[in-house]
Amino acid sequence: ETAWGRTPAQPSLFPYTSPESIWNEHRESTRGRDLDITGMSYAQLERSPLQWPMPEGAVQGKVRLFEEGVFPTENGRARFVPTPYRPVAETRDAPYPLALSTGRLRDQWHGMSRTGTLGRLFGHVQEPALHMHPQDMARRRIKAGDLVQISSRRGAILAPAQASAEVGLGQVFMPMHWGEEFLSGRSSSGARLGGVNTLTTPVFCPDAKQPELKHSAVQVQRTDFAWHLSALAWLPADTVLRQRTALQALMAHFEFASCVLFSSPTVLGQTGRSGVMLRAAGQQPPAEALLDEVHTLLQLDGNDVLRYADPKQGQRRAVRLQRHPDHTTLEAFLLSGDTRAHDWMSTLLREAQPAQDYGRALLAAGVAPPLPVRPADHTVCTCLNVSEQAIQTTLTGCLGSPSERLQQLQNTLRCGTNCGSCLPEIKRRVRLHLQAA
């Protein structure tokens, strides 16, 4: 306010004493509108979710908007606007034979300025990736996890490929959230690579003003880099966001880079641990000083760190272990050069599995672990930390119709009973389990 020239004699533009007072102002701004929530209170929302609209005097929200048949027009009647069919702005052709669509992730919101600061919300989808039909991948000799270049008439980005039968042939999908804060790199000309919207068209609907982000013509090609980096580290809660920001500032020094948070599995309301995952690649190893900076930010520069280095071959490995009374856990690691051990070492770290028997074998890590590692389980319900395996196991004891089995499942595990965003996936798993029975 001082920067805007406000004097002490003028009223404050931010007269808020609590988060509730901010919310109360927002609530009042909805009065009389189709999203009227003036019947809600902050205390009610603290206890449980509420459905809008819920105007003042209502005891519960409406199940359907405009259910009484009155619409926000001058005469209260709905208006239908005839809109002629318009083809997509950009058609596929030989140079760009695939249709790129973008959209939301279940647990993230738009630019992730808020959700992107919570490691637990990366539990459902852990890192940026391009989703492709398995047959389209096979035709291009692309395997899951391979880095690919996605090109459109406007630019190009790099990302790992991920097989998905939910994506149709000739189509690819990338979540709209993966901007340059999480997915970046450096082009051959030295320019910083942007996120997914580097690829999309600038065309928008003349009526609704919605951008045409659901269809862009692209080409996808496997990209083979000679050098790779993979690093994960648990970090102190009071510094993890600051260290992630510092790592993000280094992303443009690599030809490909992604940087995201992760967290320990916890139930909503509990405080878990948080960490950062950095992945990078290039045709040549980067400067040693850059890798030293990454080591420092991931707290891999202390005396308690096991190290191996072969600068001539571009190989570096660093491992930080934590001793507990009855076991040892992997707290951080960095693989530079040969990163084939990423998957099982990541599981070892994220799941806090005992690591005391691995010792220095972690520095000679290859594609196969020297000792068995329990596979990581996929999180379905982020709010209540319910895994796919827990759902499958519980469903074996459920009986009745799909709705009855769903109710039994929720009575036991409570999955899908908080925010509800995972409910479609849970219902799908109930149907699939019933079909397989």
Model-predicted segments: where are they?
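Long, contiguous, secondary-structure-rich segments that constitute the structural scaffold
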Residues: 1-37, 41-42, 115-131, 135-302
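Long, low-complexity segments enriched in small/aliphatic residues
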Residues: 6-115
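Short, glycine-/Ser/Thr-/acidic-enriched flexible segments
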Residues: 76-78, 85-87, 103-107, 135-137, ...
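Cysteine/selenocysteine-centered motifs that mediate thiol-based redox chemistry or coordinate metal-sulfur cofactors
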Residues: 190-216, 356-389
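C-terminal catalytic lobe of FAD-dependent flavoproteins
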Residues: 260-362
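Immediate flanking context of iron-sulfur cluster ligation sites
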Residues: 368-378, 400-417
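Local cysteine-cluster metal-coordination motifs and their immediate loop/turn environment
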Residues: 378-390, 411-428
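Cys/His-clustered metal-coordination modules, chiefly Zn-binding fingers
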Residues: 396, 412, 431
